[in-house]
């Protein structure tokens, strides 16, 4: 369990292998910082995108000027946000495409954010490169943000690079 000191706190992750943390005091002033080297088969200039689709939506890299976001924030409430099976089942309509219909075929990784309106889970997603969809075996839970609704998460809550 992690708690901040009030004000703005930074929670640091160097990779997807550190295990799942429970952050008890995450707030709008706080930052999740990742030193992980995300794949870059596409431009990664877009830090975060919000998806309000009931089970995720199709993300079209072509309509995003060739950019693949590092963070996908899913704001529809997911009662099973804390299990990999619950997340992969919930995101049944989400997939990453190059043009709206052609699934990506390269290995990509990203952060997936999903919650139930009260708590939020942060997942590392390492797409196998076969279809651009989220599979249970491709997910690693990084953190649970207790009493934080991801609907209010913005790019200011996420940073990249070393400490």
Outline where the language-model segments fall.
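Low-complexity acidic/polar repeat-biased segments
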Residues: 62-163
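Acidic, glycine-rich calcium-binding repeat modules characteristic of RTX/beta-roll
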Residues: 1-68
């Amino acid at each position: 369990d992690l708690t901040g000191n009030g004000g703005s706190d930074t929670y640091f992750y160097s990779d997807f292998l550190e295990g799942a943390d429970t952050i008890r005091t995450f707030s709008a002033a706080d930052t999740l910082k990742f030193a992980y080297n995300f794949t870059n088969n596409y431009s990664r200039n877009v830090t975060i995108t919000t998806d309000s689709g009931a089970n995720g939506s199709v993300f079209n890299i072509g309509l995003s000027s060739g950019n693949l976001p590092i963070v996908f924030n899913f704001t529809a409430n997911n009662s099973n946000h804390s299990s990999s099976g619950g997340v992969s089942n919930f995101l049944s309509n989400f997939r990453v495409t190059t043009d709206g219909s052609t699934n990506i075929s390269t290995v990509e990784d990203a952060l997936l954010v999903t919650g139930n309106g009260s708590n939020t889970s942060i997942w590392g997603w390492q797409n196998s490169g076969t279809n651009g969809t989220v599979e249970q075996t491709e997910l690693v839970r990084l953190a649970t943000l207790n009493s934080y609704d991801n609907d209010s998460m913005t790019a200011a809550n996420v940073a990249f690079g070393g400490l």
